[in-house]
Every structure is written in C-alpha cells, then in structure tokens.
Amino acid sequence: RIVAAWDQFKRSGPAPDGFSYGTIYEGEAELLAAQKDTINIYGYATHGSHVAGIAGGSGAGTDHRGVAYEANYLMVTFLADEAAVIDAFSWMKAKAKEYGKRLVINMSWGLYNLGPLDGTSLVSQAIDQMSSDGVIFVTSGGNNGDETFHIKKTFANDTLSSLVEFYNYAANANMWGQSISMWGEEGKTFGTGFSVYDNSKKVLVASPLYDLAITSG
C-alpha cells in the first residue's frame, strides 16, 4: 500500500521530479530493495509506523484497524527545515494528483522549531494555501505538556544573547541543511546577528548586526 517514499537525507538520488536533493523510491520493487530510510538525526524508531498504523492500518491479525484502512501511503523522511517540509508537502500533492487520490497529510512530528507558532511561519502559510486546494492536514494534540522547553519572560534589556545548539555533523554523516528561525514583534524594530564559536568559546566567524523595521506580521 506504500506508493512511494522520499528519503531527503540520502544524496545518491534519483531525486523526485522538480527537486534536486534526496532519493525517491516508487513501486514495490524499489521500496523492497531500499528496505529502510537513511540513518539520520532522528535515529531509527517506530513512531512513523505507529502513527501510520493509527491512520490507515489494515488491522490484519489484530482486533483493531486504522481510520482509513484501505488508504495508500506516501512516506517522507524530511530534513528538519521549513523549506524541506514544504517541499515534502508539494511532492505529496503532485503525487496524489498523479494517482487521482485525495491527500491527507499527517503531521504527528513533535517538532516545535519550525518558526513561530502563531500561524505566520512559512509552514503555516503553506498549510493555509494547500488547505484551500483541498489538502487535509492532521496533527496530534502533543504529549510534551511536562517538558520545559517553552519560556515566557519580559526582559528588561532590549539586547539578548542566546546559545543555539546545532546537530553534530560528525556524528550524523547524512545530516545537511540546518536553519534558525527568528522573528520580532509587529511594528517594532528587530535586529539580529550570528556568531560561530568553537568548544573553547573562541569566535570563529561573526556576521554584522542586521536591523529590520518590521511593519507587518
């Protein structure tokens, strides 16, 4: 029932039509030959299979089956980057049209680092646009209620410094393409700069400070 899969981490190709990265597998023979996606920052786990089973598992040999138990699947192992996610959406939309199917995209990811959560991010805008075209997006309610990665604070100073940890390329041979999302308050001036440090806290490279007057959300 898996029609095709796009492994965005695998560089050997061939990439899907219209894209220049990753490797696509389409049809039973290619999917069986691939066996698995490329090891990456997420590691191997059962989360994708788990939620796919909830969405459309056949229930064979069990007392339970998924909601859309006769549906076909499109799979994407995507880079943790807004552009890559939107590429995945676009590829799925085109592939569903090719096969004459309605498209429902599952977003049970547990990722909260793809831009602001107020509907203005690039991913949110893509979802709005594709929803108007009839694509259905499904997401989980989340299970991070006891995690302490959200903060709310009013700072006395208007200049802040923050440390950002990147994924270790040496430990993740197939990792490439990382990004940082930053945004300011509508109608206020927002400036940002970026510096790279080594393990001894020595500055290796630093950008200028860029000031922007934000006039819209």
Question: Where does each model-flagged region fall?
Answer:
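Subtilisin-like serine protease catalytic core
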Residues: 1-85, 100-104, 132-136, 148-149, ...
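Substrate-binding/access-modulating region of protease and related hydrolase catalytic domains
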Residues: 78-155, 159-201, 210
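Solvent-exposed serine/threonine-rich low-complexity stretches and specific carbohydrate-binding patches
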Residues: 204-217
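Short intrinsically disordered, low-complexity coil segments enriched in acidic
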Residues: 1-5, 196-198, 216-217
